[in-house]
Amino acid sequence: MNNRVRLAVRNSLCVAALALVPAIPVGAQQSSYPPPVNFTAEQDHQNMMDQLGIKKLREGPSGDEKAPNHANYDESLANPYPNLPDPLTLANGQKVTTAAIWWNERRPQIVEDMEREVYGRLPKNIPSVTWTVLVTDREYVGFTPVIAKKLVGHVDDSSYPLIKVDIQMTVVVPANAKGPVPVLMMFGQSVLPNPTQPPQEDLDKINAALKTLLEQQDPSLKAIFEQYPGYSPVPSQVRPFTPRTPGTPVPEPPSTQVLIEHGWGYAAINPASIQADNGAGLTRGIIGLVNKGQPRKPDDWGALRAWSWGAARGLDYLETDPAVDAKHVGIEGVSRYGKAALVTLAFEQRFYMGLIGSSGEGGAKLSRRNWGESVESLTGTGEYHWMAGNFMKYGASEATFGSKNAGDLPVDSHELIALCAPRLTFISYGVPEMGDAKWLDHQGSFMAAVAAEPVFRLLGAKDLGVTEDYRTAKMPGVNVGLLDGQLAWRQHDGGHTDAPNVKYFIDWADKFIDAKYVPETPAH
């Protein structure tokens, strides 16, 4: 656990009481700090172009196949840079033949290239995080009783009080578990699953007291309440039972329910509470706090790396929770959060496993592939904030350094997957017909997984079992899982979600957990 992170568990009633204490004016203290720079995304984007000496960027492809600049979906044109960087060759040309050479030499080289050119570096001066449990509640997920905790991780802002960062996380575990349980941390909204409601008698008292208070503030409300005697300011949250129409299919339960029913827990962490998902927010959030409200430098971290840092801080808390099996915590996300989940698993070796959903460019997709989403998609004003500023160089058509493209990248996504080895890495996609767009390049992501296989094998893990060269390897059929090794692949028949693969992920991961598989990494 990061020894800079201080963990605190406080009674939620004390927190509520403190909220009632008048705040001490801090205007005089804060006036000595320069205010954060207020850039639009376009202004911040231009600022980075100026720093890099970029005069013009190539336009990214359109997802509309009828547009003049539509993305390529012709496989014969998809591999303009067919030869990938070899993850098992050192920068000096020497081959990596042992695990020791990988851990001590090659892996650090890949990490350096990834940090400098693609995702950005973690600053050395990131403030500490203090976790507080705001609510502990006994609830139900489906028909399973659970213990749910709502937490906030406050980032120390004493170095720059003008920016506040409070990480939102919810942790839910089965109430009747016999011991600590595996937990899947999921990027998404942090909400309690089904908060316990007061009985009707108590709810009536709450409403009566609330009506009295409202009438005291505004006497005219008395007549309104008398006109509508059945109205309650706080309605019951108990949902009425709705019978299912005969003949309609039974809907699949949500992923969180599937996890709980299999004896797992989950933690929902809100990325927006860590770093905003836009370029205008780069002088705010954790990136802005560390930079004291100033714009980024070219190798500073982007939002994907910031979200992954927040997930690691969430893991700091989970390591202190006796209900959590902290040695078996995974990370999950879909789409942009699938990118973040893969980045998290690659850089934070304490995570035992990852479910990487529909991650596309910047995630599992090979950047060197000319198919759908491209490097240029991530260098424009809409998505550049996910990456390090330096990544914009690879979309440049005119610059002081000339021009660069995806073929100039020192690394590619197969090496990001390789950084996860030998830990459990499950690559998940759906099908275009159901909404998991061709844009994501399912084939290119599969090729990346195949190209990462040698690293898994070198480190004593089992790979996908694909023997073909990554250049010619073809995806297995839909709903055909490659689930025998620590590196796994499955394309389900649903849309832009990993929900249909969650039950397969759990069974696959349980196999290794039950076998007491311990990845041989420096973290262990």
What are these regions (language model features)?
Residues 29-122, 508, 518-524:
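N-terminal pre-domain segments of enzymes
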Residues 168-170, 179-189:
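Short beta-strand element of the alpha/beta-hydrolase
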Residues 185-320, 360-370:
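Cap/lid segment of the alpha/beta-hydrolase catalytic domain
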Residues 244, 286-290, 297, 353-416, ...:
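Mobile cap/lid helix-loop segments that gate and shape the active-site cleft of serine hydrolases
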Residues 323-335:
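Alpha/beta-hydrolase fold nucleophile elbow
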Residues 333-345:
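Glycine-rich nucleophile elbow surrounding the catalytic serine of serine-hydrolase chemistry
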Residues 421-441, 492-494:
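Conserved strand-to-loop "acid loop" that flanks and positions the catalytic carboxylate
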Residues 432-433, 450-524:
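C-terminal catalytic histidine-bearing segment of alpha/beta-hydrolase fold enzymes
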